[in-house]
């Protein structure tokens, strides 16, 4: 497994960067490079290069900081990038295995207020996924523009997948019917962990639960945790879902398609 990951991180990256023929030959790769798209070009300009040792230090430091203060979203983001390459490789395989996932990787859509027509979503039927997403944002007073940029991943394709994961987080909340309070966040993290395999999701689920108050913890253990584990194991892969093409779909139908059930009010 380790050999497979090393090959995929070194060889395709050299190709995707569009190295000159001489450089490509020196690195033992074919000079025919896969052209970079706009996301990949911009990412390679902005990314921060770190050594394997620096990656270990960043991973350890960010995990401690995130544990001490879960509000440090910058540390949580750093932890996700320094520990998630293996899981992202598996997610990439999943994306490439479906037509919908392939389309996402080819088009690399972004989720911002500048890319989503929220007036259109507000005009959709109340039982549609798009209308439910707008309601979720308003009810929880959140915005899709608050996600941190990816900086520490080497492979731009994996960087896009991490970006996509972050920008789709509120969409996962919506389809799961979970609010952004502590109980809701921990439950969603369990579903994401089991669905994506990202270590930071497991960390957020485990350590987030530790910080629950006694009353919350009882509800978590009796209702939220069993529900989250069941949905995380049973649901179809969520990363290959082209959410932006599902706005008009009935939320109930989308949940049925993905194998998701909603937690009854407790």
From Swiss-Prot:
Its cofactor is Zn(2+). The keyword rRNA-binding does not apply. It is found in: Mitochondrion inner membrane. Its EC number is 4.1.1.130. InterPro entries: Coq4, Coq4_euk. GO terms for biological process: ubiquinone biosynthetic process. It is a peripheral membrane protein. Pathway: Cofactor biosynthesis; ubiquinone biosynthesis. Zn(2+) binds at residues 169-170, 173, 185. It catalyses: a 4-hydroxy-3-methoxy-5-(all-trans-polyprenyl)benzoate + H(+) = a 2-methoxy-6-(all-trans-polyprenyl)phenol + CO2. One of its GO terms (cellular component) is extrinsic component of mitochondrial inner membrane. Keywords: Lyase, Membrane, Metal-binding, Mitochondrion, Mitochondrion inner membrane, Ubiquinone biosynthesis, Zinc. Its main location: mitochondrion. The keyword Ribosomal protein does not apply. Lyase that catalyzes the C1-decarboxylation of 4-hydroxy-3-methoxy-5-(all-trans-polyprenyl)benzoic acid into 2-methoxy-6-(all-trans-polyprenyl)phenol during ubiquinone biosynthesis. HAMAP family: Coq4. Component of a multi-subunit COQ enzyme complex. This protein may be expected to contain an N-terminal transit peptide but none has been predicted. Belongs to the COQ4 family. This is Ubiquinone biosynthesis protein COQ4 homolog, mitochondrial.
């Amino acid at each position: 497994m380790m050999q497979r990951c090393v090959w995929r991180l070194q060889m395709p990256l050299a190709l995707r960067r569009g190295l000159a023929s001489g450089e490509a030959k020196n690195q033992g790769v074919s000079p025919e490079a896969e052209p970079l798209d706009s996301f990949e070009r911009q990412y390679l300009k902005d990314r921060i290069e770190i050594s394997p040792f620096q990656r270990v230090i960043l991973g350890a430091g960010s995990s401690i900081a995130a544990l001490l203060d879960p509000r440090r979203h910058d540390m949580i983001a750093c932890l996700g990038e320094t520990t998630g390459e293996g899981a992202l490789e598996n997610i990439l395989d999943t994306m490439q295995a479906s037509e919908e996932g392939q389309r996402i990787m080819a088009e690399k859509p972004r989720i911002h207020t500048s890319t989503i027509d929220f007036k259109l979503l507000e005009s959709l039927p109340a039982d549609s996924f798009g209308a439910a997403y707008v309601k979720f944002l308003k009810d929880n007073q959140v915005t899709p523009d608050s996600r941190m940029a990816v900086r520490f991943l080497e492979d731009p394709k994996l960087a896009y997948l991490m970006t996509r994961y972050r920008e789709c987080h509120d969409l996962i909340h919506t389809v799961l019917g979970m609010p952004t309070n502590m109980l809701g966040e921990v439950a969603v993290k369990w579903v994401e962990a089991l669905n994506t395999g990202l270590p930071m999701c497991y960390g957020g689920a485990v350590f987030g639960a530790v910080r629950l108050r006694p009353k919350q913890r009882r509800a978590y253990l009796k209702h939220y945790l069993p529900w989250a584990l069941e949905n995380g194991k049973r649901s179809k892969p969520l990363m290959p879902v082209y959410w932006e093409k599902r706005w008009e779909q009935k939320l109930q139908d989308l949940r049925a398609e993905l194998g998701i059930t909603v937690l009854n009010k407790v």
